[in-house]
Amino acid sequence: MNALLSNPFKERLRKGEVQIGLWLSSTTSYMAEIAATSGYDWLLIDGEHAPNTIQDLYHQLQAVAPYASQPVIRPVEASKSLIKQVLDIGAQTLLIPMVDTADQARQVVSATRYPPYGERGVGASVARAARWGRIENYMAHVNDSLCLLVQVESKTALDNLDEILGVEGIDGVFIGPADLSASLGYPDNAGHPEVQRIIETSIRRIRAAGKAAGFLAVAPDMAQQCLAWGANFVAVGVDTMLYSDALDQRLAMFKSGKNGPRVKGSY
């Protein structure tokens, strides 16, 4: 494979290695580059809940490219045209939100593959992903470097988890704790014992199926628990939350009556 098409994040998942990540919601290439120099294994650049345009995502991919931290792009939705754009700007690993059924998972796989294996539009000659046509035989080899992760974050998705896990082309499944807990009837309470039980069993089912299991845990003890359950790509913080906490802590050192860091149990 051409070295430009290698995907260390995917290779480590295949080996079952644990990878520790950070969620990026700040939407700036400057903050993304700072995060990339910190040594996290992967960085989730969020296009779902953060106000990132396709240009913002592009600039953040450029910013982290010189560093070892591997970027993961989460588009706002699983639209075929948006997935095409995100892949063309050079994303190799995608996290697709709100995948509830095996049919939806198959549609996502198809959107990432060129014909005859899928429906991805052909435009390698004008795409950063193919270095504007300079990567020889890009279309023939790109599938090997693509890593596709889907989010299971509803009761419907849990009911269909085994079928989703059976879809060829899905490399991993990410448990979305905030939406999942709300769907189960425990909004803003991912720490509820029933939610925790379901998270544990889901992670174990994902790993038993030979797929990578992912999670976002802003509380360190929850991150450690998910790792103990077998999750092997875990984000342990969100840049905007860490930044706001650091600001609060510093101000509290100098102004009486100011609160310390906020207690945050979920994203």
Swiss-Prot record:
The keyword Secreted does not apply. It holds the Pfam family HpcH_HpaI. InterPro entries: Aldolase/citrate-lyase_domain (IPR005000), HpcH-HpaI_aldolase (IPR050251), KDR_aldolase (IPR023593), Pyrv/PenolPyrv_kinase-like_dom (IPR015813), Pyrv_kinase-like_dom_sf (IPR040442). Keywords: Lyase, Magnesium, Metal-binding. Homohexamer. Belongs to the HpcH/HpaI aldolase family. KDR aldolase subfamily. NCBIfam families: PRK10128.1 (NF007521). This is 2-keto-3-deoxy-L-rhamnonate aldolase. It comes from Escherichia coli (strain SMS-3-5 / SECEC). The gene is rhmA.
